[in-house]
Amino acid sequence: MQTQVSGPASHVYFSQRLRLHYVDWGNQDAPPLLLVHGNRDHCRNWDWVAQSLRDRYHIIAPDLRGHGDSQWVYGSNYSMIDYVYDIAQLLEQKQFFPVTIIGHSLGGSVVLQYAGIYPERIRRVVSIEGLGPPPQMIAQRSERPASKRMREWISGVQAMASRAPRCYETLEDAVARMQEANPHLHPDQARHLTVHGTYQNEDGSFSWKFDNYVRIFSPYAFNASEAHEIWSRVSAPTLLIRGTESWASDPVADGRVAHFPSVEVQNIEGAGHWVHHDQLERFLEVVDDFLQAD
């Protein structure tokens, strides 16, 4: 597969006093397209997608707070609304409207939230496994007492405070860990993602760029009814994508697709959670067909 791509330009912007990073793929006069990565990933996850679409769109891809080359927060404040706010700030500062947005996992949740809050600003939206926890998981969590969830959250934050970033003796060791986490990856993909997702320590070892605190999720129960209300306000054409080999449940089978006014669902065979990596060519075909429908 082709993995060598000419790189984008790096920029910074500020949101809630944080110095956040994004890349710009040029083509300033083309329609705007925003790409938002998932948890513990980074903006260069999108390089192959951006390379394919850059001739037709002005593409920007941010590093979410605590990820990639964006600043870490003080404390452990990595909530959904903060991520959404950061995206709102970036789009507002660049006046990037009307925008087509594509997000993966956490990023897929962020773009759906933003599209429901500001439906008038969105042209089209693609969410790759971005609907949050499956309904069955939400039901199981809601059965657990709030006091127990809070106690476990406090213990988790305390444990994270003593957790040092993992160090890999060589870059190849980090690449191997990347490929272990997603066996679907081509070796060249794994290397590319690792090169852009690590920094080299003073002793020569390598560590992931993301803040370990992004691993911690809110102890408050996922509010499905509020999510459904927000999704119902997404007036732009919406494409929900899922890998058939992923843990994510089918939004048609579990009923969540019913909350979107204008929606299409695509299940990609042979793909796990990272559909845009696992089956890149098929993913691009599906997305291109969807975007060309304008």
Regions found by a protein language model. Give the residues of each.
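Conserved serine/cysteine hydrolase catalytic core
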Residues: 198-258
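Alpha/beta-hydrolase fold catalytic core
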Residues: 1-34, 54-57, 96-97, 132, ...
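Conserved alpha/beta-hydrolase catalytic His-Asp/Glu region
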Residues: 162-221
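Catalytic histidine-centered segment of alpha/beta-hydrolase-like enzymes
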Residues: 271-284
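Conserved hydrolase catalytic core segment
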Residues: 97-143
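Conserved HGGG/HGGXW glycine-rich cap/lid loop of the alpha/beta-hydrolase fold
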Residues: 23-72, 76, 256
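Active-site loop/oxyanion-hole signature of alpha/beta-hydrolase fold enzymes
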Residues: 15, 54, 60-106, 138-144, ...
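Flexible "cap/lid" loop of the alpha/beta hydrolase fold
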Residues: 123-169
